[in-house]
Amino acid sequence: MTQCCSVTNETYFYHQRKSDGMPDVYSASPRTLGKCICIITGASKGFGRALAHEVSCFLMSGSVLILVARSENLLQQLKEELQSITEEQQLVVHCIAADLSTKEGLNETVRVARQEAVNEIDHVLLINNAASLGNISQFATFSDLDEVNSYLSFNLSSSLVLTAGILQVFPCRPGLRWTVVNVSSVFALKALPCWVLYCTAKAARNMMFNVLAKEEPNVKVLSYSPGPMDTELQKDIQRLTGVINQLLPCQEPAAKLMKLLLDNDFPSGAHLDFFTV
């Protein structure tokens, strides 16, 4: 489990991995993400939820946290979980219940971000986490164009359109730091039989954000593979494939991503994996 608490001007975070429950990593950092507007998609469950907890510990007073997911109830529960941190650090939290595969959902997310587009913000952090598993079937079964388009609309197109929309709301200017995170997978790099939809979307997203890194030198872009986590998606994978993997608690990959963002020394466009950094 990952915990964080503020002590004077330092933020401490703890990572527990050992089977006996004792922490094997302890670190303290005065660093923050600045006065930031942070947008997390797929925030209501699993990795996105863990990221919301991690990120909120490192935001300066007056920062804005925009949490996007389909379930309004789960988002409100998350907001309540974060209340002690957000009140202490005077954060503004918006919960957007939206389907990002639709124009309406994307437009609402951009609209809320636009209303927070004030000059005092010095860091824009967009974490494209929302994704789905899709149909695990043989390549030759995908003859329904609507099924394929629907999957790619949510898992690929939406992250392109949302990122472009937020870039337009917060154009690069002196003093503004821009970071885009693409939550990726080892299957963006490795083909797996029967996973054509998932592998295609993850690989295309990696290339899409590589293009962004080439086009926008002032935007720091990271594709991050968090590994197999204890999430509903991974449980679906185990149920469908019968393959049982040891699953990571979501807090561990979330904490490692936060360290990468705070260190900020990765090359833009990099694909980094939880197990190799």
Task: Please identify what each model-predicted range represents.
Residues 44-45:
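Conserved glycine-rich cofactor-binding loop
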Residues 219, 223-225, 231, 236-277:
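C-terminal helical subdomain
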Residues 127-137:
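Conserved NAD(P)H cofactor-binding loop of Rossmann-fold oxidoreductase domains
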Residues 72-73, 97-111:
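The beta1-alpha1 cofactor-binding region of Rossmann-like NAD(H)/NADP(H)-dependent oxidoreductases
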Residues 1-39:
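Non-catalytic terminal and boundary segments that flank Rossmann-like NAD(P)-dependent oxidoreductase
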Residues 82-104:
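Rossmann-fold cofactor-recognition segment
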Residues 60-78:
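Conserved glycine-rich Rossmann-like NAD(P)H-binding loop of the short-chain dehydrogenase/reductase
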Residues 132-133, 143-145, 151-152, 157-161, ...:
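Catalytic loop of short-chain dehydrogenase/reductase
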